[in-house]
UniProtKB/Swiss-Prot annotation:
Spans annotated as Disordered: 100-121
Organism of this sequence: Prochlorococcus marinus (strain MIT 9312)
Coiled coil region boundaries: none
Name recorded for this polypeptide: Small ribosomal subunit protein bS16
One term of GO molecular function: structural constituent of ribosome
Amino acid sequence: MIKLRLKRFGKKKEASFRIVACNSTSRRDGRPLQELGFYNPRTKETRLNTEALRIRLTQGAQPTDVVRNLLEKGGLLEKKERPSIAIGKAKLEKEKVAKAKIKNEENDSSKAESDSNEAES
């Protein structure tokens, strides 16, 4: 499978990245199939070879999360609503439990009201 990912280069603690197409089993700084762009996180500079990127995407290349974000900012991919990774499963589970408790309390209160109305009749 072909992946679109970042290849690190530059000085120590002053990293820059090249956006490359490479085999998914190859090393991070291994020889890429094709260089498709450049990204400098310090200056936020991004250069994309749009034609080559479109060709690779139509061939079925899968971008990594960071490259996907760069392509979305560059307008090559549509922005998709993705659930935040920061929200843990435990937090989601707590929210579900809290919602279920609220529903149960509402159901109990409505049953109590209907029971009292029937008793009065």
